[in-house]
Amino acid sequence: MKGVGTEIGTIHFVGIGGIGMSGIAEVMHNMGYSVQGSDMAESYVVEGLRSRGIKVMIGQKAENVAGVAVVVTSTAVKRDNPEVVAALENRIPVVRRAEMLAELMRLKSTVAVAGTHGKTTTTSMVACLLDAGGIDPTVINGGIINSYGSNARLGDSDWMVVEADESDGSFLRLDGTLAVVTNIDPEHLDHYGSFERVKSAFVEFIENVPFYGAAMLCIDHPEVQAIIPKVRDRRVVTYGFSAQADVRGEGVTPIPGGNRFTAVLRQRDGSFRRIEGIELPMPGRHNVQNALAAVAVAVEMGVSDELIRGGFAKFGGVKRRFTKVGEVDIGSGAVTIIDDYGHHPVEIRAVLAAAREGVQGRVIAVVQPHRFTRLRDHMDEFQGAFNDADVVYAAPVYPAGEQPIEGVDSAAMVEGIKARGHRSAHLTTGADELAKELAATVQAGDMVVCLGAGDITKWAAGLADAIARERAGA
């Protein structure tokens, strides 16, 4: 923290295995702070923290916070959590995750990446290009960056790249020197109350940029474009495929595993310069759009065209963002298994469009809706999100702590998908049933795309082996 050394005592993270909490904990540990935490279950994140020397306790009990100096929580942690109760009883400061992240950001100049979708991938791309440019930023991301093997890293420079989560409004604490907004959709209305308040929060986020900074805004997205006139006294750099964009993508051409494109940069004197032949090893037009945001940041920070090209060529992607997790050899070819975090209709459409770009056979979507309230609020959009899938399997809703809502379930979603003209949409009850069904029906060249923010990732991880076993036993 600014003006304070690292000898402040132990900092305890409640729910340290959460992807947002773990990154802050890891960076603070690497900075020399004494860090520990607790979580409700073992996970690969917990295992990774322990391997880096951070003490993690399973189970949340009052005694876990004995003798600590500060307790850090996320908004998911309730005030009746036994560790929080014990901290308050003992007058131990309890701070939110965003407040701690904001303290870290005060130590450095920051690129803060916000938006309803695409934050994690865009944050990773920005970090990749700054690495390529020799800037060596500290990074705190909302997903595992494959080249780091972690979602966080302590860099040597005065720059930090962070994912700014808008879900609970806490991103307004994060004052970025450079701010990126990828898109704005009506999500997290339980917190904001209305979409108008969501949009107002993004305007405030942009206006928190200092006068010497800039905001990189995706002009292709209508809601982002609509807030540009409301930003009156901060410099705005637009990006996208629009002819009006300051950083424009053109000539997008599919290549194996990704896309090649040209970035056309509008200079301050009105002239243009082109960065041609950028190869992004990640499929999907939406990912080219994310890459343009990273180009805008990199150019602002003086990274050369050649280093931008080289940085993208080495981009290793993000865990659970169109990640290949398996392959099944079926004699005449192979079936590819993809794991993706997409759990909102906009994300699902983008992921399936990316799959359609490179698949030789069929696209088979396996979706696990995440939260009953999200499915209720976006049922129509979910039912229309699967046009690029030849076959759809819907798993039971992952509740994420919510209670069921009558009439809001995967069966209702599947009925709506079929009512809209889809010829092959089905329910599946579990990973074993899915493996049996796929073993009997997959064809060479098919791509199975598992979608969701719940435990569908575990299905994806074991699916290739399960299909192979079923086929061997047939």
Curated annotation (Swiss-Prot):
Keyword field: ATP-binding, Cell cycle, Cell division, Cell shape, Cell wall biogenesis/degradation, Cytoplasm, Ligase, Nucleotide-binding, Peptidoglycan synthesis
EC number: 6.3.2.8
Keyword Magnesium: no
Pathway given in the UniProt record: Cell wall biogenesis; peptidoglycan biosynthesis
SUPFAM superfamilies, alphabetized: MurCD N-terminal domain, MurD-like peptide ligases, catalytic domain, MurD-like peptide ligases, peptide-binding domain
Protein purpose: Cell wall formation.
Name the UniProt record assigns to this protein: UDP-N-acetylmuramate--L-alanine ligase
Annotated source species: Novosphingobium aromaticivorans (strain ATCC 700278 / DSM 12444 / CCUG 56034 / CIP 105152 / NBRC 16084 / F199)
Lineage: Bacteria, Pseudomonadati, Pseudomonadota, Alphaproteobacteria, Sphingomonadales
Gene: murC
